[in-house]
Regions:
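Eukaryotic intrinsically disordered, low-complexity regulatory linkers and tails enriched in Ser/Thr/Pro
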Residues: 1-22, 26-70
């Protein structure tokens, strides 16, 4: 799911503990499946999410389409 938040868009993912969080995909540097999906940001922060690598990829692609369509 994609949200408009104060002039920028964020993507919703679910942390491994079930908590839904919004991430800025522009800061996403690396998506790994180890087998858990680990998101690494340009800040060095990492989070483990329930979504698969492919699901994260699709969310980011959808985000980019929305950004460039407007």
């Amino acid at each position: 799911m994609i949200f408009l938040m104060r002039e920028f868009v964020m993507v919703e993912v679910t942390k491994i503990n079930g908590v839904k969080v919004l991430i800025n995909p522009d800061l996403l540097e690396l998506v790994e499946e180890t087998p858990d999906t680990v998101l690494t940001f340009t800040t060095g922060r990492k989070i483990i999410v329930k979504e698969s690598r492919q699901e994260v990829k699709n969310l980011v692609k959808s985000y980019r389409k929305d950004i460039f369509a407007n």
